[in-house]
Amino acid sequence: SQGDLSQLTLAKKLKELLDRAPRKDYKMSIQHFAFSNDEFFDFVRENNLSVNISALAAYMDIWPMWEKAGLYPKHFLTQNFLRLKDVIDDSHFELSIHSDACNMPTRPLYGVYKAVTRRDDEDQEISDSRVQTIDVVTGIRAITIEAAKQNRNEELFGSLEKGKRAS
């Protein structure tokens, strides 16, 4: 669900399902989080939903290509692109960073580097109209415990505790 409309549609569907069958133990995850808008964030917040965001931070490597090709309206690339700081600043969201083997090297720290620096593959800073960088600790959590929680595996791995697997 890379686009802003798909994310809002998913959030509305979640609200509809929870209205029909309320429960507290649900998990909703949005994969390939790329473009989002204020309407999505506001809807989630206003309806007190909880959404796990799984971002592919390596999208920053292809951002310049999108910009040069004019594939997206300018506001998509300067205001709505990988709003990771907005995610971590809002208690209605959890952030994990993932790696699609075909899109990004399967090196988790590469994703953290991208999320922390917001630099493309030519080491140029992404030109956002608002700050969307995250700190290193949040980035490490996003590839460890938050990634494990998203898949309901936090009892098995994701943190350094006795009895957990290193993975």
Report each predicted region and the residues it spans.
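Structural alpha-helical segments in enzyme catalytic/regulatory domains
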Residues: 44-48
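His/Asp/Glu-enriched, well-ordered alpha-helical/loop segment
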Residues: 5-28, 33, 38-42, 53-167
